[in-house]
Amino acid sequence: MSNNQTLFERAQRTIPGGVNSPVRAFRSVGGTPRFVARAQGAYFWDADGKRYIDYIGSWGPMIVGHVHPDVLAAVQRVLADGFSFGAPTEAEIEIAEEICKLVPSIEQVRMVSSGTEATMSALRLARGFTGRSRIVKFEGCYHGHADSLLVKAGSGLLTFGNPTSAGVPADVAKHTTVLEYNNVAALEEAFAAFGDEIAAVIVEPVAGNMNLVRGTPEFLNALRALCTKHGAVLIFDEVMCGFRVALGGAQQHYGIKPDLTCLGKVIGGGMPAAAFGGRGDIMSHLAPLGGVYQAGTLSGNPVAVAAGLATLRLIQAPGFHDALADKTRRLADGLAAEARAAGVPFSADAIGGMFGLYFTEQVPASFADVTKSDIERFNRFFHLMLDAGVYFAPSAYEAGFVSSAHDDATLDATLDAARRAFAALRA
């Protein structure tokens, strides 16, 4: 029995399902999860000592690679001064100033410890600001595990949402309306029916949890116009795509200014950190200034802030995002070319440092499109690549990530492994 198997069996005795986040359990793809022993740059090593090229990067935060020396040094500098204080620090001001500088739509920002906290708090703030209750989200977009966001579409376009998780009361779900992503007509119909009831629309401008699906400019511009017309708060959930699609996030890429933005992953540099921020007149409704309560013992944790600040400074290097996008595009195009040469139906897309792999002929534009992917073939591909030392997301519904540490050698090795994997799929 491998060390990974031994650890997984042991973990299941004390941790539900053996993991602390469901996708890690390999339920979708089968087999034994890899327990990570250490990581460096573009690689990690599992409990059996096998090395993998890592295209998850802790699900997005490791944009400069694992254990970057500048990030490590920043963390080491603050450790000797204390791990957590429950009081303000100068570093909190510095990271807030950095975020506001890089994302112009953010006039003020509040630090939290997870993406779920960020979206949950942003929705509460939007409701407090507008005095309304209804939330609009989109099928396939994941915004964390707050009750009001674990909701799927009802049987009709404008029906109340239905809970997708046990433990979510129907009375909570009924305040969430779920529409099809990239469907402008559905959006217009919803606003025509109850636009003046909508507190907020929350959207991933580049979705990453139904695999990678880009918002179309038409769709996102319609969102902005309709929210403005009806007084609803437009929330961009950029926990995943923030600082990855562009230095100023997807909103910079599309040239669209949301009212509130949720950030995470990259701003913690691998540590637990997230944030939400936006217009000053909205943010002023937060306690202690206003009546919308939000708090957190570890919010603005000095160790996490140090890692995040170091990462944000590294990604401002001239040409950083252009180089990252070029690498990611080379990977996506190379995989598509290898599949085409092997005669395997496959498509790929990339934007900034994110990519998507689909066992379909066309790049998807909605969750319904994503569900047409050949899941069995994806699972086989995943394990063939895993055996070859390449670690993609263990689910056909997750985006992948490239870091600045991925070099030509890692990309070449990945494409060589893919050539063999696609040939095996065709056989």
Swiss-Prot record:
Enzyme nomenclature, EC number: 5.4.3.8
Pathway per the UniProt entry: Porphyrin-containing compound metabolism; protoporphyrin-IX biosynthesis; 5-aminolevulinate from L-glutamyl-tRNA(Glu): step 2/2
GO molecular function: glutamate-1-semialdehyde 2,1-aminomutase activity; pyridoxal phosphate binding; transaminase activity
GO biological process, one term: protoporphyrinogen IX biosynthetic process
Compartments, record wording: Cytoplasm
Highest taxon, organism lineage: Bacteria
Positions of post-translational N6-(pyridoxal phosphate)lysine modification: 265
Pfam families for the chain: Aminotran_3
Keyword Transmembrane: no
Substrates-to-products reaction catalysed: (S)-4-amino-5-oxopentanoate = 5-aminolevulinate
Cofactor dependence: pyridoxal 5'-phosphate
Keywords from the named record: Cytoplasm, Isomerase, Porphyrin biosynthesis, Pyridoxal phosphate
Predominant localisation class: cytoplasm
GO CC, any one term: cytoplasm
Keyword ATP-binding: no
Record family assignment: Belongs to the class-III pyridoxal-phosphate-dependent aminotransferase family. HemL subfamily.
Subunit organization: Homodimer.
PANTHER family (alphabetical): GLUTAMATE-1-SEMIALDEHYDE 2,1-AMINOMUTASE (PTHR43713), GLUTAMATE-1-SEMIALDEHYDE 2,1-AMINOMUTASE 1, CHLOROPLASTIC-RELATED (PTHR43713:SF3)
Protein name in UniProt: Glutamate-1-semialdehyde 2,1-aminomutase
